[in-house]
Amino acid sequence: MKPVLVLAILAVLFLRLADSVPRPLDVVVSEIRSAHFRVEENQCWFHMGMLYFKGRMSGNFTEKHFVNVGIVSQSYMDRLQVSGEQYHHDERGAYFEWNIGGHPVTHTVDMVDITLSTRWGDPKKYAACVPQVRMDYSSQTINWYLQRSMRDDNWGLLFRTLLVYLFSLVVLVLLTVGVSARLRFI
């Protein structure tokens, strides 16, 4: 009974560890160009080699405004245009929402820029987001986390990934080999 209880407690701890990953950093640029616009939500994260963006910006918008979400890297530059269908206007005012899921990234991403411009104006940077890695320990993702942690020299991610992988191997061996619940060391 003790090993089952210990394994259940460890499973709960690891599940809580996966859920306790900090929320993505919200880095708002200090030089806001106008007090008429406000970034209310700004998140970006990695999951299985894909980059996800989610955010909301409100203010004094017209249909001529559009928001660009761009990936900034030392070796690569990509601008994802968010316009048209994300523009909303209701009793609270006009706002933009973006929820871009699963943009494939094969390079190092340093930052995600949020820029605002009109059809004829120059884009002005309003916010930036540093992507965080969201943890999902399944058999398909372990290899991706190991590669990413070694590439980025992220020892915490490497340690957590190896710990969860070894724990899952031990549980797999205990369940498949049929070891009795009376282990001497527990």
From Swiss-Prot:
Keywords: Disulfide bond, Early protein, Glycoprotein, Host endoplasmic reticulum, Host membrane, Host-virus interaction, Immunoglobulin domain, Lectin, Mannose-binding, Membrane, Signal, Transmembrane, Transmembrane helix, Viral immunoevasion. Its main location: host cell. Residues 35-133 form the Ig-like H-type domain. Glycans are attached at residue 60. The chain crosses the membrane at residues 161-181. The signal sequence is not cleaved. It is found in: Host endoplasmic reticulum membrane. GO terms for cellular component: host cell endoplasmic reticulum membrane; membrane. Residues 182-186 are cytoplasmic. Monomer. Retains, but does not degrade MHC class I heterodimers in the endoplasmic reticulum during the immediate-early period of virus infection, thereby impairing their transport and maturation. Forms a complex with beta-2-microglobulin-associated class I heavy chains, which accumulate in the ER. In consequence, infected cells are masked for immune recognition by cytotoxic T-lymphocytes. Belongs to the cytomegalovirus US2 family. This is Membrane glycoprotein US3.
